A protein has these predicted regions:
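Single conserved hydrophobic/aromatic residue that forms the stacking wall/gate
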Residues: 1-13
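N-terminal Lys/Arg-rich, disordered targeting/topogenic segments
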Residues: 12-22
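Primarily the internal scaffold of c-type cytochrome electron-transfer domains
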Residues: 21, 25-29, 38-130, 168-310, ...
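Hydrophobic core of alpha-helical transmembrane segments in multi-pass integral membrane proteins
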Residues: 34-36
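Long, charge-dense tracts
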Residues: 129-153, 185
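Long, mid-chain structured domain cores
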Residues: 137-147, 162-176
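Long, structured ligand/cofactor-binding scaffold of large enzymes
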Residues: 152-155, 162
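Catalytic cores of Mg2+-dependent Asp-rich isoprenoid enzymes
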Residues: 487
Length: 490
């Protein structure tokens, strides 16, 4: 079979049917009495309670009888979690360093013309930076008042354990429709223990209701998930494709018809969903977020029951000091603990195997990017020549389909390794639809009396591409700097 998850029955079979036989003991968190809870309460500037991690100092008062003030400064899990601040690892295509993706791929700014991602798109750092990096992103704008700015509060949904805390006193509809800046003084903790662990037992738990809701709509219950399944589902809470529903901006996962790129596209089409209208081509486009969980399930590791934990949080230490490393990062940074837990080849061979998959996917990704970029530019040219809505209808549909496939593959972290065959298939489909769109545009131009090649702008650098799509980056950066200096606490 193709390995695709295209129906409700496939979803049930995948979730309930396959488990990894681990090569090491799994009774870790509960048996280690040194693993205790993570938080003490502190009062924010608004006077409301907010979670804050105990700092690494000896002058913090600790009440071991109070679950709000239990010390886990010395646990291996907590200490390794703090290492998510490390930014020294770099692999062939990624790592935990903050690279400017737009500078590396100027065409992406044309693909996102009219959308905030054309302003700023950096590779992700560790969980420790989840709040800081959102502050600094040009995509969140420069709101100088709590009720201003371009983004909704829903953009905080996966950035902090403070969101589940706020949802205990405020319903999602009320919370998410607020402005992003309005929750700024409440969101103080980066992604951490409380996002995945129940404080009393340290067992795994769901803290994002939108994943529970998506499961329920497919006739499944999170409560029935096995421990092994939970080791991926806690990650899937945030590492999945999502969208904002309606004016209330309720965050939801589009899994109603399945997990594949076609399933999710069909769902979005059925509700007439669009993230943005392209500034050049006028196509109504969907912006993929990070369909990591979806694509992971379509690769051999996901199909064999391997969880996210085995490769991104491997067991380290020996005997009573054995624990799962909470310095979540690329498996390539610790091949001896990840790949070699199951595979007996050398680190060099295993790394080469990963890079070979990535290079092959990267090659076709660049083909799609080039064709799709030209298609948007040519579509604008056709509009400028007087094309009608009727003439461009099929072009716009093909552009929507092509860009969704490209973005689904590119936005997913680790897709080229998680599911190389499926990602290659998706990109191949995207290339086909991009080419079809360009052919249709040429036909439209011929009808309008134009039979020459469409002139292409110079978008060879980030600055040139942003200038071409009409962005005033100097003004954007100045506004952001003022925001950081006057609004964000130093």
């Amino acid at each position: 079979g193709s390995g695709l998850v295209g129906s409700e029955m496939c979803i049930r079979d995948r979730i309930k049917g396959k488990h990894l036989k681990a090569h090491y003991k799994t009774s870790i968190a509960i048996s280690l009495i040194v693993i205790i809870v993570l938080v003490i309460l502190r009062t924010t500037v608004t006077g409301q309670d907010s979670i804050k991690f105990i700092d690494d100092t000896d002058d913090q008062p600790i009440d071991q009888q109070n679950s709000d003030s239990i010390d886990l400064r010395y646990s291996n899990e907590y200490q390794s979690w703090k290492q998510t601040s490390d930014t020294t690892f770099r692999s062939l295509f990624n790592g935990n360093q903050q690279a400017d993706i737009l500078a590396e791929h100027p065409g992406m700014m044309v693909l996102w013309a009219g959308y905030a991602f054309s302003k700023d798109y950096l590779s992700p750092r560790g969980h420790m930076y989840s709040i800081e990096d959102l502050y600094k992103s040009l995509r969140t704008g420069a709101p100088m008042t709590p009720t201003s700015g371009p983004q909704p509060a829903a953009c905080w949904a996966c950035k902090s354990p403070d969101i589940p805390r706020l949802l205990t006193t405020t319903d999602a509809k009320t919370l998410y429709k607020k402005k992003w800046a309005e929750l700024g003084n409440e969101i103080v903790n980066p992604i951490g223990c409380a996002d995945c662990h129940e404080p009393q037992s340290m067992g795994l738990r769901m803290t994002r209701s939108f994943l529970k809701s998506a499961y329920k709509r497919n006739g499944l219950r999170i409560e029935d998930a096995t421990e092994q399944e939970m080791r991926s589902l806690v990650c899937a809470q945030c590492h999945a494709e999502y969208y904002f529903q309606g004016e209330d901006r309720i965050l939801a996962l589009p899994w109603d018809q399945g997990y594949t790129v076609e399933n999710i596209e069909a769902y979005y089409d059925s509700i007439n969903f669009t993230d943005f209208t392209h500034k050049l081509s006028r196509a109504h486009l969907i912006k993929a977020q990070h369909p990591d969980f979806e694509l992971f399930q379509m690769g051999i590791h996901g199909q064999r029951g391997v969880s996210c934990r085995e490769c991104h949080m491997p067991a380290v230490g020996e005997d009573e000091n054995r624990y799962n490393n909470h310095h979540i990062k690329s498996p390539l940074a610790m091949i001896d603990r990840t790949c070699q837990a199951c595979h007996r080849e050398s680190e060099e061979i295993l790394r080469k195997d990963v890079y070979e998959r990535q290079n092959k996917v990267y090659a076709i990704r660049m083909r799609v990017e080039e064709e799709l970029t030209k298609a948007h530019i040519e579509a604008k040219f056709a509009w400028d020549k007087g094309a009608t809505e009727s003439q461009m209808k099929n072009v716009l549909k093909l552009l929507r389909q092509a860009q969704w496939r490209w973005d689904f593959a590119v936005a997913s972290h680790g897709a080229a390794f998680h599911a190389p065959q499926e990602v290659t298939r998706i990109l191949g489909s995207g290339l086909d639809k991009s080419t079809q769109a360009r052919i249709q545009i040429m036909k439209v131009l011929a009808q309008l009396g134009y039979t020459q090649d469409v002139p292409m702008p110079d978008i060879s650098t980030k600055a040139k591409a942003q200038q071409y799509i009409g962005l005033d980056m100097e003004a954007e950066q100045q506004a952001k700097q003022k925001f950081l200096e006057t609004v964000i606490p130093q």
